[in-house]
Amino acid sequence: MKSTPKLLLLLLFIINHHVDSGSIVKFLPGFEGPLPFELETGYIGIGEEEDVQLFYYFIKSERNPKEDPLLLWLSGGPGCSSITGLLFENGPLALKSKVYNGSVPSLVSTTYSWTKTANIIFLDQPIGAGFSYSRIPLIDTPSDTGEVKNIHEFLQKWLSKHPQFSSNPFYASGDSYSGMIVPALVQEISKGNYICCKPPINLQGYILGNPITYFEVDQNYRIPFSHGMALISDELYESIRRDCKGNYFNVDPRNTKCLKLVEEYHKCTDELNEFNILSPDCDTTSPDCFLYPYYLLGYWINDESVRDALHVNKSSIGKWERCTYQNRIPYNKDINNSIPYHMNNSISGYRSLIYSGDHDLVVPFLATQAWIKSLNYSIIHEWRPWMIKDQIAGYTRTYSNKMTFATVKGSGHTAEYKPNETFIMFQRWISGHDL
């Protein structure tokens, strides 16, 4: 009987250690049978008191997890849950597009998961995004620079709890608004690796899809993109160029000619699906809509059985929302231009893959090409098509700063529009091969 307290203490230690390190998920409601891959979910506490709890989904590589690269995936927004990447862009599961009937929506396996060749951490950030939360009221408004430091701390703590992945090549990745966070994060990790007494992160590079980089410039390139895609007439294009002088969306109220022309531009484009101009602009609650699975996602992830299976802290969050910061949570966008971070990361010698769906109106490929050109690195491999079998899947170019730019033909703002092509592009690049 005297040994009982010691046994209880040991048991508590084991339980606490298990919770801190994450919990293995073997089954998910909506998916038949055990998961055909290893999924871990959990929280990592940030700050001295660890009041900020960042939620993650970790999926081991299906090939060789001990040696394959470790990726961190951040969804955009800011404030969109990373499970949108997992279930819609590059994960091993997807929601089956079937009319909602009141039961838990179904999940199916995918053929295009990046986890076939990489370990991936899908991270919900900032605080309030997905299942990440704070135990106490926030004192400071979440911000770009604040999130960079939080994510860096997350990675350090996650790797200390998963030391078997410390030597794996590490890549930061994401799309859309992550274009403001990932380059700064790479620089932060790079600097942190030189600080004494902390195990270095084996940083090798980064990957960004349709990244927001310099919002005003990104936005202005919508005009030449729209002209090139035959969305506006030659006459309107020439007039708007002449009278707006390259500034189309932050117009001086006194420039009435420009304002009128911009109004004409909106008449031509406002009814488009700006995320992919080839796709219908329709209500996601319609089963005929390409994005109907987003509607199903809300029902799936808010089901109590799903949240239990994912080991979500019951007291942490109410109704899950796909993107929170766009509507109701304050956020300080204090990085307005991420080009200097790209420059610093290039100087430091990190590899990068920057890809653009070529039918995205939100961040047109022309804007991405422009800031890459502004880095002023020489071209190593000239513009050429990259192929899948005997078909052109997009176009690519490589630069002397180890940066590869690629378009994905027919794709939009995120990889979900062409997941198979994006997967093949990623698989070739991460393996060090030409696209």
UniProtKB/Swiss-Prot annotation:
Instruction: Give compartment(s).
Output: Secreted
In this protein, the residues bearing a glycan are 101, 313, 336, 344, 376, 420
Recorded E.C. number(s)? 3.4.16.-
Keyword Cytoplasm present in the record's keywords: the answer is: no
Q: Which InterPro entries match?
A: AB_hydrolase_fold, Peptidase_S10
Tissue occurrence? Expressed in roots.
A Gene Ontology molecular function term for this protein is:
serine-type carboxypeptidase activity
Query: For this UniProt entry, which residues form the secretion signal?
Result: 1-21
Identify the Pfam families for this entry.
Answer: Peptidase_S10
Entry superkingdom: Eukaryota
Question: So where does this one cross the membrane?
Answer: none
Cysteine-cysteine disulfides: 80-323, 244-258, 282-289
Q: Which GO terms describe its cellular component?
A: extracellular region
Name a single GO biological process.
proteolysis
| Key words of the record | Carboxypeptidase, Disulfide bond, Glycoprotein, Hydrolase, Protease, Secreted, Signal
Q: Does the keyword Hydrolase apply?
A: yes
Q: Which family does it belong to?
A: Belongs to the peptidase S10 family.
What the protein does comes down to: Probable carboxypeptidase.
Under which name does UniProt file this protein?
Answer: Serine carboxypeptidase-like 12
The species this protein was found in: Arabidopsis thaliana (Mouse-ear cress)
